[in-house]
Structure formats: structure tokens, C-alpha cells
Amino acid sequence: MEKIQQAYLYMLKVEKQFSEHTLKSYHDDLEQFNVFLAQEHLDLNAFEYKDARNYLSYLYSKNLKRTSVSRKISTLRSFYEYWMTQDEAVVNPFIQLVHPKKEHYLPHFFYEEEMEALFDTVENDAKKGLRDRVILELLYSTGIRVSELVHIKEQDIDMTSPGVKVLGKGGKERFIPFGEFCKQSMERYLASFKPKLNSNHDYLLVNMKGDPITERGVRYVLNDVVKRTAGVTEIHPHKLRHTFATHMLNQGADLRTVQSLLGHVNLSTTGRYTHVTNEQLRKVYLNAHPRAKKEN
């Protein structure tokens, strides 16, 4: 990998504070671009708009989803913009390249009874249930990203006005409240689970060795919980974020509030969560339409 590409990734890590998962995606996008350059005997310094169009065709030939292609093009556009700030790249060959239209999809989420089943599973785990419950509670009760979760320190938790302070994308800080269930789980965890592991750091969540838990560790915990929960087959941290947003909106929270809680810059990003379940649609219809119910 070229030095300028390494410098770009370092900037994303240090200045933008991107998560490990996001950094890996950017790294892989650049590596795939480098493979194309080598195959086509092209020079990074002499890459032009026509070459960018050819690269777009190359990506489509790999049968990638439009969302994946769009992200890879965004990575390279951003990389060249960074390069130009270093007074090395003269032009950005991707600046005029039209983004492929993204596929529209409804975010997957859990129903409330599925969430209760997950909580029942961790409640019955005597060994590590207290820790796993806090992970579930924080992800579901606050909608935070897994990258934000693993960086929470004990001093970021406020038990007086229950909530947590997190550092989001771009180093932006926000405070998210949580309820009594989450508060009680946190108190039990801090009182009886974490002290037994003799942790010599102030990160909130730990693995079974007492070290700060990683994003991979959180995913492992969630997958383990799902394996032991009847009727639930798939889970990932972002699905809990989707669930938080969906349940908040279905219960009447306004879009701007949810945007603020999620840490979204654009309201349109939050807007995709305005899908509702069929049960919610029927509930609203029955309560709102004058001819939905027949008087006896």
C-alpha cells in the first residue's frame, strides 16, 4: 500500500476516530483499488476520470451490491480529496463519477417479545449474565453503536440522571438517557461482577479476563446469547440500534429526538427508521379511522 494511503487511513483513525470495523472497510476498499491498478498497469499518480469509469465497471463485474459499489467509490473520492489537501494530487478523478443508486431496504429489528426472550436468556446465566445484560441493555436502551459501547468508561455513566456520555463519529460527544432497567443492571454489574475480575482500568465493559471488551467480543457475546434463545436466529449490534429507533418511533417519539439520540448528522438517515410493523399500522388505523369500528 502506498504511503499516502497509509497516511489517509491514519488520519481516519486519529482525527475522524473511525471504528475498527469502518477502518477495515476503508482499508479493503483501497486494497481492491490497488489490485485494479496493478492489473491494468495504471499509476496512482496518473489516474484519470476515464480510468475511474473503468474501475466502476470493474466493480460491477464482481457482482457487488450497489450499496457496496457506492461505498467503495465514496472511499476513493474521499481519499483523493485528502490527497489534494496534501498538495500532491492535482485532480480528483472520482469527483464527477455518478454514484450508483443505493438499494432501499427496511432495517431489520426485533419485536418486543423477542427482546424479552433475549433478556430472559441472560438473566438465567449465573456466570456472566450480569455483564451480558448490561451489553444488551445499553445497546437496546440507548441505540449506541458497538464502537461507542466498547469505549465507555465508568466515569461516562451518570446514575443520578441516568444516562451515558459517548463519543460518536467525528469525535462528537452526546449524552443518551437510559431507564430503570438499564440502571439496575448497571448497578448490579458494577457492584458484584466487575470487581471480581480485578480490572486495572476504568473501561466499563470487560471480558472474562478483566480486559476491556472489544467489538469482536461484543459480537461473540450476542451470538452466544442468540444460540440459547428460542425463536431468535440472528443478531448483530446494529440490529439492536435499529430496534431502539423503531420502538422509539412506534411509541410516539419524534424524528428529531431520535436523530439526536442516534447521533445522526442528517435527518434523512434517521428517516429510514420510520417504517412501522403491521401491528402498529393496524393499531393506528383502528384508533384513527371513523369507520374502523362498528358500534354495538
Swiss-Prot record:
Start and end of every Tyr recombinase domain? 105-286
Q: Which GO terms describe its molecular function?
A: DNA binding; tyrosine-based site-specific recombinase activity
UniProt family annotation? Belongs to the 'phage' integrase family. XerC subfamily.
Name the gene that codes for it. Answer: xerC
Keywords from the named record: Cell cycle, Cell division, Chromosome partition, Cytoplasm, DNA integration, DNA recombination, DNA-binding
Q: Read off the InterPro entries from this record.
A: CB, DNA_brk_join_enz, Integrase-like_cat_sf, Integrase_catalytic, Integrase_recombinase_N, Integrase_SAM-like_N, Recomb_XerC, Tyrosine_recombinase_XerC/XerD
Protein's cellular compartments: Cytoplasm
GO annotation, cellular component aspect: cytoplasm
- The residues annotated as the active site are 145, 169, 238, 241, 264, 273
Quaternary structure and partners: Forms a cyclic heterotetrameric complex composed of two molecules of XerC and two molecules of XerD.
**Under which name does UniProt file this protein?**
Tyrosine recombinase XerC
Which top-level group of life is the source organism from?
Bacteria
The UniProt record lists the keyword DNA-binding: yes
Q: What the protein does? A: Site-specific tyrosine recombinase, which acts by catalyzing the cutting and rejoining of the recombining DNA molecules. The XerC-XerD complex is essential to convert dimers of the bacterial chromosome into monomers to permit their segregation at cell division. It also contributes to the segregational stability of plasmids.
Q: Name one GO biological process term.
A: chromosome segregation
Core-binding (CB) domain: residues covered: 1-84
The UniProt entry lists the main location of this chain as cytoplasm
